[in-house]
Regions:
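Amphipathic, small/basic residue-rich leader segments at the start of a protein or domain
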Residues: 1-77, 88, 98, 102, ...
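C-terminal helix-coil-helix/basic helical segment that borders enzyme active sites and/or dimer interfaces
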Residues: 23, 262-265, 276-337
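Glycine-rich beta->alpha junctions and the first turn(s) of the following alpha-helix
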Residues: 183-280, 355, 389-391
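A structural signal for short hydrophobic beta-strand segments in well-ordered beta-sheet cores
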Residues: 128-131
């Protein structure tokens, strides 16, 4: 029996044992994970069957046709796209067994404690400290622009464990329980009125050494797995043709012939072609994951995602004229989903402004593409081989 046929049979068995029409959503997701049909390329016992990642489409198609419930990447995207692949590569067997199932089902939401007020684009300059105390690490510092921290049970965290080493070398990667004493989450309100992001203060937070990911001092290398997956997750998300931002403006174009002009038509066609190229590039980028780690090419995909979202949402506002500017819902909200295309045109236009900042600023990503994809010389650095504690701040 081929792998595809085997997966179809297992999917049929899952549906027979847990009919979607009569099974609780969460119970179904747990059963799907236990059947190895959550992410089929993961090992057996961890939600997968150890088969090629490309075969996930077989399972997804069968379950969609049966009307089966699924998890929501808009709510748990950080866990699915960033934490899970990092835990799979660097985690202990105990960490994988404890964390991956509730991560995938959405029972436990994850957030990312990386950026700091003084270390965003230059992330390796981070100053949050982790000091060893017996079997624990005591963490103190501040993180910022943390999506979903107000919902999260767990966080992926990088902190400085050796200030005497150069900035990239004295960092260690941890898994932080967001319910621990000393963790304080405060909302950061955006120009849309909502507070999707947060700042997180860590005061004498004790993290067991058993929740360290990778070796002490090797956190920067571990974090590259997270960051590369983040850029693929943001820029290379699977989108159907005429989905996403381009789908919104295309729908408006069809519904409102009174707004059409030849100039707007030509510009919309150009953006539609670019969106289709980006969609197909995303397909190719995701195929790279089948063979293993995503590379720095994800930076280019994320760059294009930000530019396209901003241009398309800008054209939509221009198309609608005064109607496109009628965004007046500044109610303080704490959303449970990250939704770039939700609500109306005014919201999409305002929200898209953050796309060129989150997940790495466009300027930083241009450097990554230049140095790691094109092989151009790196920019001159004055902090190379200088201890972090001696850097000007």
């Amino acid at each position: 029996m081929t792998d595809a046929a085997h997966l179809r049979r297992r999917t049929e068995e899952l549906l027979a044992a847990h009919p979607p029409a009569t099974t609780d959503r969460l119970d179904f997701l747990r059963a799907r994970f236990d059947a190895g049909l959550a992410w089929v390329h993961f090992p057996q016992g961890l939600g997968g069957l150890g088969v090629p990642r490309s075969l996930q489409a077989v399972v997804d198609a069968e379950l969609a046709a049966a009307g089966a419930p699924d998890n929501d990447p808009r709510r748990i995207g950080i866990g699915l796209g960033m934490a899970a692949p990092t835990i799979l590569q660097y985690g202990t067997e105990e960490q994988k067994s404890r964390l991956l199932r509730p991560l995938w089902t959405g029972e436990e939401v994850w957030c990312q404690l990386f950026s700091e007020p003084g270390a965003g684009s230059d992330l390796a300059a981070l100053g949050t400290r982790a000091v060893r105390d017996g079997e624990d690490w005591v963490v103190n510092g501040q993180k910022v622009w943390t999506s979903s921290a107000h919902l999260a049970r767990w966080a992926i965290l990088i902190a400085r464990t050796d200030p005497d080493l150069p900035k990239h070398k004295g960092i260690t990667y941890f898994l932080c329980d967001m319910t621990d004493p000393g963790v304080e989450v405060r909302p950061l309100r955006q120009i849309t009125g909502e507070a999707e992001f947060n700042e997180v203060f860590l005061t004498d937070v004790r993290i067991p050494d058993a929740m360290r990911l990778g070796e002490v001092g090797d956190g920067w290398r571990v974090a590259q797995t997270t960051l590369n997956n983040e850029r693929v997750a943001i820029g290379g998300t699977a989108v159907p043709r005429e989905g996403g931002m381009i789908g919104k403006i295309a729908a408006t174009w069809r519904e409102r012939p009174d707004l059409r002009t030849h100039d707007l038509h030509q510009r919309l066609l150009g953006l539609w072609v670019e969106a289709e190229v980006a969609r197909l590039t995303g397909v190719r980028l995701r195929q790279q994951l089948v063979a293993g780690q995503p590379g720095p090419e994800g930076a280019g995909m994320k760059l294009n995602f930000a530019r396209l979202n901003q241009e398309i949402s800008g054209l939509e506002v221009e198309l609608l004229g005064e109607e496109g500017l009628l965004y007046d819902d500044w109610t303080m909200r704490r959303p449970e989903l990250v939704n770039f295309t939700g609500r109306d045109a005014g919201y999409r236009y305002l929200r898209s402004k953050g796309n060129s900042i989150e997940g790495g600023t466009s300027e930083v990503l241009l450097n990554i593409v230049a140095e790691r994809v094109l092989g151009l010389p790196a920019e001159p650095r004055t902090d190379k081989d200088v201890a972090w504690k001696d850097l000007a701040r």
